Each structure stands twice: as C-alpha cells, then as structure tokens.
Amino acid sequence: MQFIEGGVTAAKGFLAGGIHCGIRKNKSKADLAMIFSKTPCAAAGVYTQNLVKGAPILVTRKNIADGRAQAVICNSGNANTCNADGEKKAWRMCEIAGEALGIDPHDVIVASTGVIGQILPIAPIENAAPALAALLNENGSNMAAKAIMTTDTIEKECAVKITLGDKEVRIGGISKGSGMIHPNMATMLCFVTTDCAISVPMLQKAIKAAADTTFNMISVDGDTSTNDTLAIMANGEAENEEITEENEAYKTFLEALTAVCRKLSMMMAGDGEGATKLLICKTTGAKDWETAKTVAKSVICSSLLKAAMFGEDANWGRVLCAIGYAGADIDINKVDVSFKSAYGQVDVCVNGAGINFSEEEAAKVLHEKEITILVELNSGDAEADAFGCDLTYDYVKINGDYRT
C-alpha cells in the first residue's frame, strides 16, 4: 500500500470540484461541492446515530438503498436540519445534480453541513450547479474538500493505491469536521471513492468495519452531529476480479480503506475547533477489542484530560478517572499510564498508582503538537486507538460566535 495524491479523484473515472454558490456570505468561501463518477457505482454508507437526523441523510438513505450511486452533492453553511421543508429541498438538490450531470436523481448522494434550524436557500444551488458541473475535473478533489468545510482550518483529503491480482486499485477520500464531532456510526462528513470492483454487500461491510476503528473513535467535544455521513462509491474501473466474499483481496482492500479513514480521522481530530494538539489514546493489553475501545474513548472524551493536555499538565489522575467511569471490566490495580510525543516518553503511573517523574520533562513531552496517552491494562492482547484534541479557550470563543 502506498499513499498518493489526488483525494477523491485519485481513483479512475472520478471528477470533483467546488464553487461559491451564495449560501455562505463570504464570497471567498466555496460552499457547494460535487463528486461524479463517469460510470455507475456500487454505493454504501453509515450515518449519525443521533435521533435528530438531517434531511439529507433521510434522502440519501433512500437513494442508495439499492446500493447504487453516481454522484455526490454537498453544501456547507446550512445543515438543512429541523426544517419543515428540509426533505423536499434535499431531494431537490438531488434533482439539481441529476439535471446538471445528466444522471438519475435517485443516484445522487446528498449532504449538508452548517447551522441547524435555518431554512436552506435552494436558489443559489440551482443557479450554481450547471457551472459547477462544467468545472468538475480530475484534479478537483481539493476544491471539493474546501467547499464542504465549516469551522475547519484545513482541507482534509487522502488517497492510497494497492495491487489486487495484477490490477492497481485506488481509494481516496475527503472529509470535514472540526466541532460537533463524537460520531457513532465530526458535524462529520466523509466521501470516499474507489475504482475497485466490489459487490455492494462487501462494500457495506468494509465501510462499516473501517468506520468502527477510525471515525467512530474520534471525539472533539462529545457532541454527535445530526448530519454525520460516511459514504463510499466504487465504480469498478480498476477491472480487478470483483470482491464478493471475505477473501485475501477483501482483507487487502479493507486494510487500505481503513488507512484512508484513519488518516482522515486524525486530520479531523487534530483540526478540532480551537485545538492546538492532536491527542491519541492507545489502549493495549485489554482482554478484548470492545474493552480496549471503551477505555480509549472514555479517556479521549474527558474534558478534564483535554484541558490538562492544553495546559501541558501531566495530570495522570484524570486518565485513571476516565478509565474508572468507562464501564469496562478492568482491574485498575494493573493499569499503567504514560505520555509520549516526539520529544520522548514519561511514565507516570504503574499498577494503578503514581510514580516519581520529572514534571519538567513531562511538560516538555506535552509541549509537542501530537500527544499519545498510553494506557496498558495488562489483561490481554487486544488494543484500540481513539483520537481527539485538547480543549482550549478558543473552542468556547468559536462556538459562542458560531451563528454571528
């Protein structure tokens, strides 16, 4: 497997682009994106577990219930959620994309991100869609990534290539997410494309498995958005032997898909609203993956721990506290905790009790931009990683002014 450039247009047959249509007031901010496959695709997705779901999710689920899609249309600046006419407008967006691209509107994945509860203006999308469709190209992934951003500070895209048999297969993705990120499938949107030939059931299985160990392991602020969507389209243009079962080809594909999702997840976590540090909680020595996952997520979700990391304070008690209320079946007297970064590693807790360590050295470890919290449970061989960021003053400022 090799990481490559190209995002959602790295795979054969995919075009993408973004444009400012007028939903957002700032004309320098693109707010409408499209991704298009020249040929029909197998499609699959996973969505928010929030009981309040954005209208685009309701429409997309219906559209890809048959496992087929050919395009994505997504706006930023308005979530199209909790609106009386939301579903009607989400469907209208599918029609607009279908008309502009010459495809069936039922083959369109629709998504929106932005403020909840505001009426979505449809005219700007209608007016801009033909121009956007004309701009789509094989180098348009970055513009599409920009167009789906809200409070993000960087565009997020990633791609890899692998070999299946004698064929080169590519997988690429773009994502957005900076706040309201605590998925259980960040607002989290991710669109993945691949030229792999793979059946719909196996594609759905793969995207669910990849999400479980990547996107579902992120927490920026503990809020699960109404619009979280992870969708994948596979057009088969790599011409590999179609993957229809859990064979070696499927395992290779899943590993590559997970790598793309992991990279995007880490970019999202590190770009959390107001964040200055990417946090990774690596839990090892668990009796099973479920236990490792539960502990890792509990630690990464702790607001007290996030604040301590911002302050570069090696307050390991907050780690043990989060482990204690995680609800996992563990022996706290076996737990070891360390903090690690590019500077080095400092051990702070052994067998559930504090040990002597240099606070000065610990502060230097925590001064780096990427911090790993190592939690060793000493009860088995399972492990899991969770991703998050520190909690800063700017998080409050950003969300206090979000609608202004």
What are these language model-derived features?
Residues 1-88, 92, 98-404:
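A structural signal for small-residue-enriched, beta-sheet-centric alpha/beta enzyme cores
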